[in-house]
């Protein structure tokens, strides 16, 4: 059956949130200091775990096998099994849903605590988490760009979960090329109110019957706007009109024309939407309307996109983390074949075989490395919004912006690979839908595709992120890695630091070649963008893992081998060593390939690619 047995573990989550990242620094900020202590995270994490184990994960079978159904009509065009509403309402009532989007309310939780909550929820059901997560992202745009009056009209019921939210960018003829959108908006006699007409597709949770209304953020163009992305505006378009007092009015001519039949995440409705088929669809312009043909839509939408990109990394981590824990449990139970060191002995559990150990340590170490990258990046988001000084906020914002493409693309690329490793651990049974990794692999593939394909992330990283603010933030990010490698060496990790020194030198060589190609060979720059992005992720993850290793080594020395937590720290040391000595060295292959500068992929005639 599809994944519906919750095996997720929280010990490394708590280690990274409470022991590794400076939780006291976050909790000393004005937004949090009167409301939370470090131990509160344990309670929140444990409540979320129980919801995931007892409510969300058991419903994943129906999510995968039944999913959403399109029945048409203007009221409830997309219906779901009753258990979906139970899951949704449980999450909302526990405060583990779109409430995190409200960054102005007193007593709000630290934002970086949202990362593990979302990870664990995705590990329970990659599809069902979409029911509330997209709403939280939509509220980010609205609370920072709408007038106070319109915020009061829309946001309370979005935060409460009564209404959902969606992001409407993609059209049949405008996918990655967002500037090609054809949806139009036309001014009316009411200031700020525009008529909307057009079609959108691939809209996650664009409709479903668990909420009373869907508030769509729609990219559209004034017919007189400039071509491309410069002319795009963003409008808030409710499925049902929202009156001045916040009550729900008449249908707003937003039609769900169908839902997609997908490889995975069947429990998430991916909708096709038509706006204004009856010439009666209206929306409020977010911010100002186009000025001299230039809209504000892309800048506004990127506030949500940046958040959804790191969240895609979190989704990816949760999905392949669940696959890893399933593989780990299976490997401890499945008896098959004799040990290589005892060929005449009895058959043993497969966890005792060397190659299974390799696959498990690969999954464990990549999971923990990706978690470090994601949690540290969420920590930067928190600091960028809540730190006391402008200097601290700007630094944190810069570091997050540099790492965000890695959070989205590297982690989602690894999710597909690690789910395949989890399948492999299961042997032939891994190919059967009765075992969890099969559905998790189907579910996780979307993460490399949405919120900007991973090649787009690599272009962003090797282009804008290298050069933003005249390249100073990237230089600082790079210098911090170099300083750590140079100054944190210990005898216990001598081999690992030596490996990181070589890898860091190789990465600097990669950066130099990328910079040269910017002016001399733009096609080579494109050919290697994904590999450069992966190299950067391995460098920063190697640094973060070694930092955790230093902490774990100290803890283990302090506690001793007989302590109940000793095995956790021993496992952490093994993860650190495995990642640095087995995953980081893939950088060298990228460096050598770039030196060779092979252009066969470009030079081969299209007719010869057969």
Swiss-Prot record:
Residues annotated as catalytic: 451 (proton acceptor)
Subcellular location: Cytoplasm
Catalytic reactions on record: butanoyl-CoA + oxidized [electron-transfer flavoprotein] + H(+) = (2E)-butenoyl-CoA + reduced [electron-transfer flavoprotein]; a short-chain 2,3-saturated fatty acyl-CoA + oxidized [electron-transfer flavoprotein] + H(+) = a short-chain (2E)-enoyl-CoA + reduced [electron-transfer flavoprotein]
SUPFAM superfamilies: Acyl-CoA dehydrogenase C-terminal domain-like (SSF47203), Acyl-CoA dehydrogenase NM domain-like (SSF56645)
GO cellular component: a single term: cytoplasm
Needed cofactors: FAD
Biological-process GO terms, alphabetical: butyrate metabolic process
Induction of expression: Expressed during syntrophic growth with butyrate (at protein level). Seems to be constitutively expressed.
EC id: 1.3.8.1
Keyword Nucleotide-binding assigned: no
Residues spanning the signal sequence: none
InterPro entries with a match to the protein in the record: Acyl-CoA_dh-like_C_dom, Acyl-CoA_Oxase/DH_mid-dom, AcylCo_DH-like_C, AcylCo_DH/oxidase_C, AcylCoA_DH/oxidase_NM_dom_sf, Diverse_Acyl-CoA_DH
Keyword Oxidoreductase: yes
UniProt-listed Pfam families: Acyl-CoA_dh_1, Acyl-CoA_dh_C, Acyl-CoA_dh_M
Primary localisation category: cytoplasm
Keywords: Cytoplasm, FAD, Fatty acid metabolism, Flavoprotein, Lipid metabolism, Oxidoreductase
Pathway where this protein functions: Lipid metabolism; butanoate metabolism
Family: Belongs to the acyl-CoA dehydrogenase family.
PANTHER family: ACYL-COA DEHYDROGENASE, BROAD-SPECIFICITY LINEAR ACYL-COA DEHYDROGENASE FADE5
Function according to Swiss-Prot or TrEMBL: Involved in syntrophic growth of S.wolfei with butyrate, as part of the butyrate oxidation pathway. Catalyzes the oxidation of butanoyl-CoA to crotonyl-CoA. Probably passes the electrons released by this reaction on to electron-transfer flavoproteins (EtfAB) to finally generate hydrogen and/or formate.
Protein name: Butyryl-CoA dehydrogenase Swol_2052
Species of origin: Syntrophomonas wolfei subsp. wolfei (strain DSM 2245B / Goettingen)
């Amino acid at each position: 059956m599809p994944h519906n047995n919750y095996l997720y573990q929280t010990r490394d989550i708590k280690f990274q949130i409470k022991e590794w990242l400076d939780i006291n620094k976050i909790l000393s900020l004005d937004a949090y200091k009167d409301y939370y202590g470090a131990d509160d995270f344990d309670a929140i994490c444990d409540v979320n775990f129980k919801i995931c184990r007892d409510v969300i994960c058991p419903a994943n079978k129906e999510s995968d096998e039944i999913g959403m159904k399109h029945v048409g009509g203007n009221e409830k065009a997309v219906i779901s099994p009753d258990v979906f509403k139970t899951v949704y309402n449980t999450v909302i009532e526990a405060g583990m849903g779109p409430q995190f989007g409200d960054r102005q309310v007193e007593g709000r939780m630290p934002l970086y605590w949202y990362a593990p909550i979302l990870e664990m929820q995705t590990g329970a059901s990659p599809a069902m988490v979409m029911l509330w997560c997209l709403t939280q992202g939509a509220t980010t745009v609205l609370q920072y760009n709408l007038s106070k009056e319109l915020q009061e009209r829309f946001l309370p019921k979005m935060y409460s979960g009564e209404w959902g939210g969606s992001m409407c960018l993609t059209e049949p003829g405008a996918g990655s090329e967002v500037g090609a959108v054809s949806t139009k908006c036309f001014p009316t006699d009411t200031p700020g109110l525009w008529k909307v007409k057009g079609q959108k597709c691939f809209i996650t949770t664009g409709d479903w019957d668990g909420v009373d209304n869907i508030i769509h953020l729609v990219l559209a163009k004034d017919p007189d706007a400039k071509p491309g992305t410069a002319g795009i505006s963003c409008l808030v378009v409710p499925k049902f009109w929202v009156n001045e007092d916040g009550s729900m009015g008449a249908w707003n001519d937003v039609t769900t024309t169908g839902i997609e039949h997908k490889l995975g995440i069947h429990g998430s409705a991916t909708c096709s939407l038509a706006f204004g088929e009856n010439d009666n669809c209206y929306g409020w312009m977010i911010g100002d309307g186009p000025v001299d043909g230039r809209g504000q839509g892309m800048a506004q939408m990127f506030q949500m996109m940046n958040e959804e990109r790191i969240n895609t990394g979190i989704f990816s981590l949760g999905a392949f983390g669940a696959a890893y824990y399933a593989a780990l449990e299976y490997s401890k139970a499945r008896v098959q074949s004799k040990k290589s060191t005892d060929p005449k002995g009895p058959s043993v559990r497969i966890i005792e075989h060397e190659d299974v150990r390799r696959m498990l340590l690969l999954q464990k170490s990549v999971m923990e490395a990706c978690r470090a990258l994601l949690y540290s990046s969420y920590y930067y988001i928190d600091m960028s919004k809540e730190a006391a000084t402008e200097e601290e906020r700007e630094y944190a914002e810069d570091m997050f912006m540099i790492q965000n493409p890695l959070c989205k693309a590297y982690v989602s690329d690894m999710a597909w690979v690690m789910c395949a490793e989890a399948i492999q651990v299961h042997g032939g049974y891994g190919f059967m839908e009765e075992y969890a990794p099969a559905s998790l692999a189907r579910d996780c593939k979307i993460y490399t595709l949405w919120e900007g394909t991973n090649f787009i992330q690599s272009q962003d990283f090797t282009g804008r992120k290298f050069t933003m603010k005249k390249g100073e933030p990237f230089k600082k990010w790079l210098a911090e890695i170099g300083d750590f490698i140079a100054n944190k060496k210990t005898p216990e990790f001598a081999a690992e630091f030596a490996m990181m020194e070589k890898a860091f030198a190789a990465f600097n060589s990669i950066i130099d070649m990328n910079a040269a190609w910017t002016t001399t060979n733009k096609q080579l720059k494109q050919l290697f963008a994904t590999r450069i992005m992966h190299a950067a992720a391995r460098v920063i993850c190697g640094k973060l893992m070694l930092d955790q290793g230093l902490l774990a080594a100290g803890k283990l020395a302090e506690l001793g081998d007989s302590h109940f937590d000793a095995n956790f720290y021993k496992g952490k040391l093994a993860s650190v060593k495995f990642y640095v000595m087995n995953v980081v060295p893939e950088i060298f292959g990228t460096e050598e390939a770039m030196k060779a500068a092979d252009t066969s992929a470009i030079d081969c005639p299209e007719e010869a690619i057969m």
